[in-house]
Structures are given as C-alpha cells and as structure tokens.
Amino acid sequence: MSSILAVVVNDQLTLKYERDKELPEHQQAYLDKLDAKFEQGIELDGEFVPQPVLEERARYMALSLMEGILYQEDARAAVSLAWLATRLPELKQVKAHVDQDGTRFDLVFDEEYRYSAEVSFTGLN
C-alpha cells in the first residue's frame, strides 16, 4: 500500500493525501454514510447505475474530486480524496488533464508520484 495518494492536474501536484495519518472518527463515519448512499445508486455519464461496483464508485468520486478542485469547493475535494484514499489503498495517483475540451483523468495504481523541482543555474557560462 502506498502511503501517499497524489492528485496531479496538468502535471502539477495539486493535492496529496497521507494515508499514515488516521482519519478522525466523524470523518470516517461520513465516508461510511457515503458508501450507504451508493447502495441506492448513482448517476454516472448521464445514466443511473442502480448497484455501482467499486470501480464505478471510484470514477464517481474522482469526478467529484475534480469538480471540487476546479470550482474551489475544498470540502468536496477533501471528502472525495479521503474516500478514494481509504477505499482504494493501492491507488497512487489521480492524474488529470484540464483544457478547453474538458477534463480527463486516470486512476493510477502502478506509479508513485515523483516529486520534482525545476532548478535554474545562472552564471555557469
């Protein structure tokens, strides 16, 4: 299990979830309520899914995460990220690309996020 779940939007680290930090009990209870709501079905890609499987739930929550980020709804993004991190312990990254054509994202299970920094050197000539 990866201890970090990274959210990368347009190649920039946007959010990260540290699985090593325990989720407070009231937040865990809220995620459990979300799971119960999923049992009633979800709308995904304009269609009602009466009994969503884990992959469909994950896609739904990843969409919610992206909307939370794009519309600066921090609570929505935080809940969505916590759900993904706790329900998919092997998930390493949510990679998204946002442009004028819309938002596309992938759930990445096989590649840890690598921190990188751009370093400029001046005066070396």
Name each region found by the language model.
Residues 97-99:
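Short loop/turn motifs enriched for small/polar and acidic residues
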Residues 1-81, 87, 106-125:
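Compositionally biased, non-globular sequence tracts
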